[in-house]
Regions:
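Acidic-basic catalytic patches of nuclease active cores, encompassing PD-(D/E)XK
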Residues: 1-31
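Active-site metal-binding core of divalent-cation-utilizing nuclease and nuclease-like domains
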Residues: 23-50
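Residues forming the ATP-binding cleft of Hanks-type serine/threonine protein kinase domains
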Residues: 33, 56, 113-114
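Structural motif
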Residues: 37, 50-52, 93, 107
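Conserved catalytic cores of phosphodiester-cleaving nucleases, focusing on short active-site segments
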Residues: 40-63, 68, 76
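Short, charged, amphipathic alpha-helix that recurs within catalytic cores of restriction-modification
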Residues: 67-87
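Domain-level recognition of nuclease-like catalytic cores that cleave nucleotide substrates
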Residues: 86-117
């Protein structure tokens, strides 16, 4: 898969993940938010919860189990801490989520996957 194809597939996965979150009552407040620490694919809000979401797409469901690692989550968490100051309101909570996508499968939303490292 070329870098351009991977980029296109990633953007499509992010659109699907955003749609999935909206169906679950979340409001998308940011997409592909870059910081010096890294990038967050989606930022979503539901009530007082801000979720910083990493989206992963793989060619098969079996590949999803190894799609995310601690190093990647640490970068998302570091970027989330930077973005938090601009996006959070008084009383908000935050968490790091992952949405896993594979052909023929419903999106798998893993909530609150990061607890520091």
């Amino acid at each position: 898969v070329s870098r351009q194809q991977a980029e296109k597939r990633g953007r499509q996965a992010e659109r699907i993940a955003a749609w999935w979150l909206r169906l679950k009552g979340w409001q998308i407040v940011g997409r592909r938010m870059r910081t010096p620490a890294g990038e967050v694919d989606l930022v979503a809000r539901r009530g007082s919860m801000l979720a910083f979401v990493e989206v992963k797409v793989r060619g098969s469901a079996a590949e999803l189990d190894i799609a995310i690692d601690e190093r990647r989550l640490a970068r998302v968490a570091a970027a989330a801490e930077i973005l938090w100051h601009d996006l959070a309101k008084a009383g908000d909570d935050m968490r790091i989520d992952v949405i896993l996508l594979a052909p023929g499968r419903a999106p798998r939303h893993l909530a609150n996957v990061w607890h520091g490292g």
